[in-house]
């Protein structure tokens, strides 16, 4: 095996797997360096994929021929479409995942991937030559060369585990932290900080009184993650639901000093939307109970993940408070929970390609950028790996705007605003969420992926067939119409306004369904469920989509105003020192990106625009 590649990916978690695959799919000779082959694709925390906002990211990864959706469908054991009762724009596909099935399927995919080598070593340092990255060095001094390197270290950069008074240097339980890489990033001058996340105890399902619990079943009709998945063959399971009690809260409150944060042993900021049970007891002191989902980790695994009680108190206290919950009175613990602190790089150090501004050729993806979650990591990994491959080939980078993808929203948030706490995706972060639905991710992105070279032949063929079907259905829906008289004669209540109405206009009327319209136009009954769903959504959102497209046009006018990469903000008049510092730090590429930087006022934008126009006219 050669010691020279086009792209090196460091880290075999969710970001690293997607980065390595995307780079290889795009035609770059790729090397994935990871400390253990057997932990590639490991789900280190909760055994689930998707959710609100997160499910959108999984669908977008899939639309670009990434792995998470397809692999998830080989391991999904409890599918649920969240927000089903609400509009399609905010629905989120989610599934419990069999950890073992997921890991095995991911490894089978990567270990046989064209253009991809996987080597199990611990990287200790980067090779930097003439101010650019040139490869990586392992703990024994072996050299691996590449002009592009993607760093996906997760929680391993100077990771420290906290469990009561116990403090262990580790990237996760059983794995050593990455000290050398963290030291190298500090030495290069990267602006870095400290974050924290946590995980709950793992319970022995054989010791849970399941018959005393409320149970939550999977959806009768599973909604797959991948557009390529036609059916789910994995057996579906139920999850249990229990609750914390007043006694639970009393035990935690009395022993709060054992917590890493409340005991003063950890300074990293934890995720706001996934608080520890200690945080819940303190922040929501008026609540006497919190819901806890008991999620089996696999079909042939008795391990249960108690979602909602991540903690860093001692093992003794964990067992005490767990046994105060209904159904867990006699529970035994397989592995106790813990908090983990780790270093991250301020994502304002990055371009929208996820390449670092400070060290050309180095890309960062995943928790190293201050995000939390498998889906956020996977989406960043895909974009970093793809852009690294495109850069090696001398091609234009892949950057999605906020109106094109949730991936674009996330990366723009990160590189423009930075983070002060672990970032997670929500539908509320997207201004154009009626357009950015989970159901149309392939319609938005697969053609882009084909042009970028990251979409393979199987997906290309499937997408071509689906695209042709949608075009034919939409053409038919626009081509046939009813006059008000015709509509009323066939049983539809329509105003006599002289307006002919096509299929979409008819569907927008109360109590009109495609099944009813099929009695008028029988061809509708031949449409596939996918086509029927898309037409129904487009009809329901028609007026709103038109208004949102107007908003997109206004957004793009600002995005089209490019700012010079070498702009000297010291020469721009009427800017405060604070605004100058923020602009110089982020180095926005467009006026729109500048507008999204905290503290940049409309007056500052006007001054900036005037300066750029004068410079162009000079």
Swiss-Prot record:
One of its GO terms (molecular function) is flavin adenine dinucleotide binding. It is found in: Cytoplasm. The keyword NAD applies. Keywords: Cytoplasm, FAD, Flavoprotein, NAD, tRNA processing. SMART domains: GIDA_assoc_3. One of its GO terms (biological process) is tRNA wobble uridine modification. Its main location: cytoplasm. FAD binds at residues 11-16, 123, 178, 367. PANTHER family: GLUCOSE INHIBITED DIVISION PROTEIN A, PROTEIN MTO1 HOMOLOG, MITOCHONDRIAL. NAD-binding protein involved in the addition of a carboxymethylaminomethyl (cmnm) group at the wobble position (U34) of certain tRNAs, forming tRNA-cmnm(5)s(2)U34. Homodimer. Heterotetramer of two MnmE and two MnmG subunits. This is tRNA uridine 5-carboxymethylaminomethyl modification enzyme MnmG. The lineage of its organism: Bacteria, Pseudomonadati, Pseudomonadota, Alphaproteobacteria, Caulobacterales. The gene is mnmG.
